[in-house]
Amino acid sequence: MTTDFKSTPPGVMVGQVIRDLVLPMNLRAIPVLSGDRLIGLVAIGDLRKVEQERWGDTPVDQVMTPVSDLSTVSPDDPLATALERFGATELPLLPVIKDGRLVGLLYRESVIGYVRMQEMLGVEGRR
């Protein structure tokens, strides 16, 4: 899990998110936060639905996937739970929620890499 991540507030325009986060940082999905509470996630697929002429007047909260439609995990969930939830989504990450707050992001490729490393080393672990 990474705790150092970029996010955006809900009222920011799509164009600003693309200009400031997506392109320079190669981010494929960005949490949308109200304070420290996750309200949604805006992914490349969401942004692509907005015509470029509308980037300057379309806020991300109009195109994001709301938190109620997202798969999430808690910091205490076992690795098997994360793997199961990744199987149910095409998103590259799972938000990690504790007490209603976003505390980190779990990236699919990191989890897969961890599992592969365990297999290569013959190590069994719960997380």
Question: Over which residues does each language-model region extend?
Answer:
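Flexible internal linker/loop segments at domain or repeat junctions
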Residues: 49, 57-58
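Short beta-to-alpha loop/turn elements within the nucleotide-binding domains of ABC transporters
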Residues: 12, 42, 58, 77, ...
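Bateman (tandem CBS) regulatory domains
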Residues: 1-5, 12-16, 58-70, 126
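The conserved cystathionine-beta-synthase
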Residues: 8-26, 34, 51, 71-91, ...
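Short hydrophobic beta-strand motif reused across regulatory alpha/beta modules
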Residues: 39-47, 97, 105-111
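Divalent metal-coordination and catalytic microenvironments
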Residues: 30
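Methionine-biased hydrophobic packing positions in alpha-helices, especially
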Residues: 1, 21, 64-66, 86, ...
